[in-house]
Amino acid sequence: MRRPNGMIAILTGAGISAESGISTFRDQNGLWENHRVEDVCTPAAFLKQPTVVQRFYNERRRALLSPEVKPNASHQALARLQREYKDGQVVIITQNIDDLHERAGSRQVLHMHGELLKVRCTATGRVFESREDVIHGESKCECCGVVETLRPHIVWFNEMPLYMDVIDEVVQNAGLFVAVGTSGNVYPAAGLVMIAKAHGAETLELNLEPSGNCRDFDRSVYGPASVIVPAWADEVLHGKGPAA
């Protein structure tokens, strides 16, 4: 396969952060406080039980900010690739709501499912950084001064992912599309590889195991993200073997 030519679009999923110590918050029965996580992460759930939903995200936010959670070698490798790749842009499209790409030094990151360390005003749509707990009925919005208007800046089930116009443009103009740590089962993210191929891009899957759409990729490499992603980045930057 040919080496990357021009823009590289990289889609990352939960697998890239799995080695960074982020908890899933599910017990052995797949529940959180006797709730299915899928039942907490919906607009209807927020309307019905906002206190419960805020508590769920407060716990996740505190866990993300704990000292033991930090970027791993795969995040660092992608940040280095963004800094050092000379033949075009490297754009990261992530399904993850953590900030580990940014902590590793990446700058061009499109969070299609939102960001855990941000909140959004339901009255104005404005988005704010937030590292503190959000208490329903107490936490006051910065822009409107009203309590009960803040919600997590997260794309819930039945909501449209963010930045899709930009993401489509990036994928359509990429010379190489790479998916790292994705399940291949969540759309529209899982459909991006076929958009890239339709516009002439080479495609590569880097994953712990075959994803749900692994057959859509031209080439696949399997193993821990902290091992295979740095190795691939070295291939791109220093010509050590096939890059795509």
Swiss-Prot record:
* Chief location: mitochondrion
Keyword Mitochondrion among UniProt keywords: yes
Which Gene Ontology cellular component annotation is one that this UniProt entry carries? nucleus
Binding locations of Zn(2+): C121, C141
Active site annotated at which positions? Answer: H113 (proton acceptor)
Binding of substrate occurs at: Y57, R60
- Keywords for the protein's UniProt record, in alphabetical order: Metal-binding, Mitochondrion, NAD, Transferase, Zinc
Compartments (UniProt record) = Mitochondrion
Protein's UniProt keywords contain Ubl conjugation? no
Task: Tell me the enzyme class.
Answer: transferase
* Gene Ontology MF annotations: histone deacetylase activity, NAD-dependent; NAD+ binding; protein-glutaryllysine deglutarylase activity; protein-malonyllysine demalonylase activity; protein-succinyllysine desuccinylase activity; zinc ion binding
Which Pfam families does the record match to this protein? SIR2
Q: Which reaction does it catalyse?
A: N(6)-malonyl-L-lysyl-[protein] + NAD(+) + H2O = 2''-O-malonyl-ADP-D-ribose + nicotinamide + L-lysyl-[protein]; N(6)-succinyl-L-lysyl-[protein] + NAD(+) + H2O = 2''-O-succinyl-ADP-D-ribose + nicotinamide + L-lysyl-[protein]; N(6)-glutaryl-L-lysyl-[protein] + NAD(+) + H2O = 2''-O-glutaryl-ADP-D-ribose + nicotinamide + L-lysyl-[protein]
Q: Which branch of life, at top level? A: Eukaryota
Family annotation (PROSITE patterns): SIRTUIN
The entry marks the following residues as binding NAD(+), namely: 13-32, 95-98, 181-183, 225
**Additional notes on this entry:** This protein may be expected to contain an N-terminal transit peptide but none has been predicted.
Purpose: NAD-dependent lysine demalonylase, desuccinylase and deglutarylase that specifically removes malonyl, succinyl and glutaryl groups on target proteins. Has weak NAD-dependent protein deacetylase activity; however this activity may not be physiologically relevant in vivo.
Family as reported in the entry's similarity comment? Belongs to the sirtuin family. Class III subfamily.
Q: What is known of its domains?
A: In contrast to class I sirtuins, class III sirtuins have only weak deacetylase activity. Difference in substrate specificity is probably due to a larger hydrophobic pocket with 2 residues (Tyr-57 and Arg-60) that bind to malonylated and succinylated substrates and define the specificity.
Its recorded name reads NAD-dependent protein deacylase SIR2rp3
Species: Trypanosoma brucei brucei (strain 927/4 GUTat10.1)
